[in-house]
């Protein structure tokens, strides 16, 4: 009997440790703010797009949707973790609504592509919206249906339950405005210039403009 009780206590201890790790991985939003977590291909681009939106406080690049705890960029892009490259957006709902952000999201990606985004192929680059409750799910599904009607094509972006969100390595945060010198296939460049060269070469904005036309919020001209 004592051995059984000890085993139960040990099992409960492991369960509590696992729960603590999951909660630790979730950034705590500031009072009066909300979060929206989306996957839209390269997280550098999604982060850059949404940090330009008035009412967005910050956007953090990271990984979610998979089973591997505390994954690295190399693990995620190599496959097998189940994680998406994702961005967690913290926003002030008094300044910008969740619905507005969802509408911007759909019009900033190719939601018809089930195999990745633009030049980035593979499961980790697929699109997705992650939700925490039934209200968020209903709103995301409604936004998806509206975007599908507007586009006139089937949208394959799933609406998934949000699990642990793991912030990506510091190197990836705010990459689009970084000043460090990096070596790329375009030669040595500052991060912000390497980002611009990558985004153009990947064809992100060209494809989004092709799909959404003037409704594309971040694609420029």
Segments predicted by a language model, with ranges:
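Flexible coil/turn and secondary-structure edge motifs
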Residues: 2-5, 13, 21-221
């Amino acid at each position: 009997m004592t051995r059984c009780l000890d085993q139960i206590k040990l099992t409960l201890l492991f369960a509590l440790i696992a729960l603590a790790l999951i909660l630790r991985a979730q950034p705590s939003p500031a009072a009066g703010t909300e979060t929206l977590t989306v996957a839209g291909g390269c997280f550098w681009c999604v982060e850059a797009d949404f940090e330009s939106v008035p009412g967005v406080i910050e956007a953090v690049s990271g990984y979610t949707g998979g089973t591997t705890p505390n994954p690295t960029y190399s693990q995620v892009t190599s496959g097998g973790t189940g994680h998406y490259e994702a961005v967690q957006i913290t926003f002030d709902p008094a300044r910008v609504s969740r619905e507005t952000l969802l509408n911007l999201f759909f019009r900033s990606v190719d939601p018809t592509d089930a195999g990745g985004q633009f030049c980035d192929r593979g499961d980790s680059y697929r699109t997705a919206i992650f939700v925490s409750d039934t209200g968020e799910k209903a709103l995301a599904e409604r936004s998806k249906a509206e975007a599908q009607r507007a586009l006139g094509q089937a949208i394959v972006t799933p609406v998934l339950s949000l699990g642990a969100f793991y912030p990506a390595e510091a190197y990836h945060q705010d990459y689009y405005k970084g000043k460090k010198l990096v070596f790329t296939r375009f030669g040595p460049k500052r991060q912000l210039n390497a980002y611009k060269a990558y985004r153009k070469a990947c064809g992100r904005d060209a494809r989004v403009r092709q799909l959404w036309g003037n409704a594309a919020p971040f694609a420029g001209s």
